């Protein structure tokens, strides 16, 4: 499946970050970004054994023209905080992977990564503000007497909500 492409200049501010994309951008189908429906789909994927990154990326993939099977395979190593190391939350990683797909012009124009980095920081910042951290082990309460700060399903919900919002803003 080849993503639908649009060529236009996109300049906008998303939570204080100015994003400019002056080349080709993948078409974003905002009709597929209903937050409640996306959260339900991601929860279903997670219940089927998808890791947090896969649940988020596979849910958002159709809205940006990415084959969910490709999203699944590319994000397999991001689960449990990057390959089980309990570092960056996989749900964030899945959302960031989608932003890279949307913003990148590919190998011919590697200069688009700056815009992707801005969106990635925005997602991580908003997730951290909502959950006090972006670290999987801390979210899960590993090594803490207080228990988890947020469950994996909760983290997935938050990442999906934030990513849907960012994608909708990009599509405007």
Question: Residue locations for each model-derived region?
Answer:
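DPxDG-like acidic metal-binding loop motif
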Residues: 94-102
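A short glycine/serine-rich beta->alpha loop
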Residues: 40-47, 78-86, 143-149
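Conserved phosphate/anionic-ligand binding catalytic regions in large, soluble enzymes, centered on
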Residues: 86-94
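Phosphate-handling active-site elements
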Residues: 63-74, 101-119
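Short, Lys/Arg-enriched N-terminal segments with co-localized hydrophobic residues
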Residues: 13-24
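C-terminal binding/interaction regions
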Residues: 115-172
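Polybasic, low-complexity association/targeting segments
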Residues: 24-48
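Acidic-glycine-rich active-site phosphate/pyrophosphate-binding loop
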Residues: 26-32, 59-77, 130-137
């Amino acid at each position: 499946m080849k993503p639908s492409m649009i060529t236009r200049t996109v300049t906008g501010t998303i939570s204080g970050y100015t994003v400019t994309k002056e080349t080709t951008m993948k078409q974003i189908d905002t009709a597929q970004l209903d937050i409640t429906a996306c959260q339900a789909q991601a929860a279903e994927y997670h219940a089927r054994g998808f890791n947090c990154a896969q649940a988020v990326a596979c849910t958002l993939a159709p809205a940006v023209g990415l084959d969910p099977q490709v999203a699944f395979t590319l994000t397999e190593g991001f689960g449990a905080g990057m390959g089980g190391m309990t570092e960056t939350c996989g749900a964030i990683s899945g959302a960031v992977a989608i932003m890279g797909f949307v913003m990148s012009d590919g190998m011919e124009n590697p200069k688009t990564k700056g815009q992707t980095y801005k969106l990635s920081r925005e997602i991580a910042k908003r997730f951290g503000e909502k959950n006090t951290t972006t670290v999987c082990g801390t979210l899960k309460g590993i090594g803490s007497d207080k228990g988890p700060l947020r469950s994996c399903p909760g983290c997935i919900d938050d990442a999906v909500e934030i990513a849907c919002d960012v994608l909708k803003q990009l599509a405007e």
